[in-house]
Amino acid sequence: MRKFLIKVGLILTAAAGLFIWFRNDASVLAGVHPLGMIDRSGWVAANSHNPDVLNTLESANTGVLFVEIPWEKVEKNPGAFSWQFENDYGSVDLTQLFSRLQRHGIEPVAVLSGGPMYLSHLYPQQPVFRDQLLESLQRFAGAAAEQFGSDVQYWQIGTAINNKEAWGKVLFPLADNALAEPDPILYSEMLRNAYSAIKEYDSRSTILMGGLEFPADCAYHPSNYLQAVADQDAWYAFDIASLSLPTLASSPETATFDACGIMPSTLSGVPSADSVQAVADALNGIGKKPLWVGNLQFSAPELVQEANTHSTIPEAIASDWLARASALLRAFGSADRVIWSLDPLNNTPGLLALQTYANLSTMISGRFAGSTLPDSTDAYALRFRGGGKVNLLAWYTQGGLTANAMIINGMEGYAPVAYSADSDSLKPKDGITLPVDDGGNIALMVSERPVLISGHPKDIKQTISQAVADSTAQASDGMKAKLSHWLQAQKAKAAIKVSDWAAKQQASLLDTLRVSLEKWIRKSLGLA
């Protein structure tokens, strides 16, 4: 017993040491929280002074919140920045907003959007001049980093960068309904400039490539756009790739949105997840980086129709579908984070969904550990492992609210407890303890409403060893990503230095030739 206690003590000491080390570099452990939200309408930004707003988001364990910094509103004249502006819902004070978010445990993601309104342009003949745009963006990004760097770690450069309307707002900031062909070459230059400006202020900052969508024009498909950025040697200039989904118009298992039909190397049978996985495959094929998938929401009319079919309320359907979609994108789409659309005025997400969000933020935060599928094509039981335990999200895709038996295997050595996805509490006493048979199986009743299952190892030694193993694996992934980013940045810096050296040598050579030519001319003319 004494030897066991000594071993446990050593393990705990080592774990504590690792924890302290990792805490000194939080980016190593980045990605623990699997979800986030985006304040697309700007309502939260204009109402952050109301304590109830951020208290609600804090209670939901929001994690990260995307907030736009509209270029045309904060820099109306070159170099004159005002971090307060008006939007459709009131006054926004970005300094106060980011500070408040941090105090509520929410990491802001500052999204640099729009274009410089003060640069000369005329739609559609003349966009803003390229060199002026690049110079202005570097100034804008640097000023924002200096102003908010103590509160903002994450920076997204642009929004919907492969969308003609969004790109039109960059090149023709003052034109209404401007359209412009997306330009990954120009965006790559913008990305490099913003990266250098922000990293110069704080090298620990995390840069996101801005919100790739799934367009109808396959030339600008996220996979093709990523390759174009890589071809411009700008792969080092971002740390995370972000996707922006359209509003989904059917259930999570059937929703489709990629008109180009680009498929991943391995199909899951879930169209939405397969479309995202295809982008993840492209991302990893070029150079592995995390993938955040944003703007998750469902069509309001579809939610109403589904609710009427099953004699329930749209908020309940939304809560269930958001949970199922989040798990599917994490499991089969390789999404490191799934970002929900936040629109409080339209009850998105509703109170039920917010509770579900809070539960999922801890229950699907681990690594995807496989799918325990019962003997049915309409059933899912997705397994996530982290923190020394195994969590599952299980549901049927048919049958409505009628519960049917489900058998899940692989639970030997665990003490599983089941909860509804929107349960008010995840304490064991508030769940249903599930007995494990001799074959490691558990049985429970499940409907289209997803069920959370949390399994802790029965043995304390196994609990400790699994917790350490999970934390080490997570930290290892973080360190590999961090090392990869650092190496890419060093290569880029070296290339820039070589380019600068070559330019200087070329200038020196040209100057020497010019002087020699002048001497020869003067000598030929008898002027020497």
Give the predicted meaning of each segment.
Residues 432-474:
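C-terminal beta-strand-rich structural cap/linker in extracellular carbohydrate-active enzymes
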Residues 183-319, 332:
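Noncatalytic carbohydrate-binding groove/subsite architecture in carbohydrate-active enzymes
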Residues 293-364, 368-377:
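Aromatic/acidic polysaccharide-binding cleft in carbohydrate-active enzymes
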Residues 60-80, 89-219, 242-251:
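Substrate-binding cleft and catalytic face of glycoside hydrolase catalytic domains
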Residues 24-70:
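Boundary/entry segment of secreted carbohydrate-active catalytic domains
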Residues 375-419:
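Carbohydrate-binding surface patches
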Residues 47-58, 134-144, 220-232, 318-326:
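Short, acidic/polar
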Residues 1-13:
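N-terminal Sec-pathway targeting helices
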